[in-house]
UniProtKB/Swiss-Prot annotation:
Cofactor annotation comment: Reduced FMN (FMNH(2)).
InterPro entries for this protein: Chorismate_synth, Chorismate_synth_AroC_sf, Chorismate_synthase_CS
Source taxon at top rank: Archaea
Protein task: This reaction introduces a second double bond into the aromatic ring system.
EC number(s) from the headed UniProt entry: 4.2.3.5
Residues where FMN binds: H121, F122, S123, G278, K293, P294, T295, P296, S297, R320
Pathway: Metabolic intermediate biosynthesis; chorismate biosynthesis; chorismate from D-erythrose 4-phosphate and phosphoenolpyruvate: step 7/7
Protein name according to UniProt: Chorismate synthase
Gene Ontology CC: one annotated term: cytosol
Organism: Pyrococcus abyssi (strain GE5 / Orsay)
Family statement: Belongs to the chorismate synthase family.
GO molecular function: chorismate synthase activity; FMN binding
Amino acid sequence: MRGRVLSFTLFGESHGKGVGVVITGIPPGIKVSHEELVKELERRKGIPGLSTARSEPDNPIILSGIFRGYTTGTPIAVLFENKDVDSSYYEDIKDKPRPGHADYPARIKYFGYNDYRGGGHFSGRLTVGIVTAGYFAKKILEKYGIRIRAYIKRIGRVEAKQLTLEEILSSENPFCPDEEAFEKMVEEIELARREGDSVGGIVEVVAVNVPPGLGGPYEEDIEADLASAFFRIPAVKGVEFGLGFKVAEKRGSEVNDPYVIRDGKVVTKTNNHGGVLGGITTGMPIIARIAFKPTPSIYLPQRTVDLREMKEVEIKLRGRFDPSIVPRALPVVEGVMAFVLADHLLFRRVWELKSS
């Protein structure tokens, strides 16, 4: 993902020797902690008992860019070794693209040379690198007092109630502040797992204390940058901000956010636009919702084709799959948002220097 100041590149494959990330643009002198990074990575493991049986330690091996606990300003390279890999099953289906996966288009794009085991480079395994990049971005945001919190808004047919910002930010539940809804969400995931199926959902993410003036029109649009970044997360199929698609059923008098003055600051009485107007932050909380499709790997029989025999066949997958990837996506969504906001903040500093 390439920003104006910051960028990161993911490398590796799900069943290769390892995966990782190279991050550029992080300023020197930022204090970081191996323990903090590991704690952030632990969140990616999801709800205990409801995630894949594949157990990777996710121990970050810092190759460069960190010295004596501080960023050096040079590229940060982080490696994660793959320790719990079983590729035997994938040899049986290498010519039979799995429905819902990138197997077929990847085979066409890379002329059949791609690593197909466990999804290869398209696997959710690589999101460990996104969370890592997000950790360093969050360290930048800390200096500005910006906080980001993602939670599960919906799993299948179960949706959390409308929550206040205070409820979202102060909740001790790492997955959803609505405890009653969360219990039903867990039941929904367990039901899908028992039936050999999977279930999708929605993650809502909020960023508070974001200063006004970040972004710009067209190419500098921060909303467009966020949406583009969210869509880079595996399994994302929809993104909306503020009221999102609900604005289509309302009138301008209902959607427009009136300006008021509170504690000497200009704010809006409502936040239907989700903190962005004209591609520029308003100073109000940025609110986005991201829709994730159900895990495409399921245990039920599915129709596909045998590309070698060129005939239609039925497959029944074996392996270790998540009944829902939504709980594991929370730190990934936060990481993506943090990276985009940090990039715009650093770019804004360049503007401020030029105008001073």
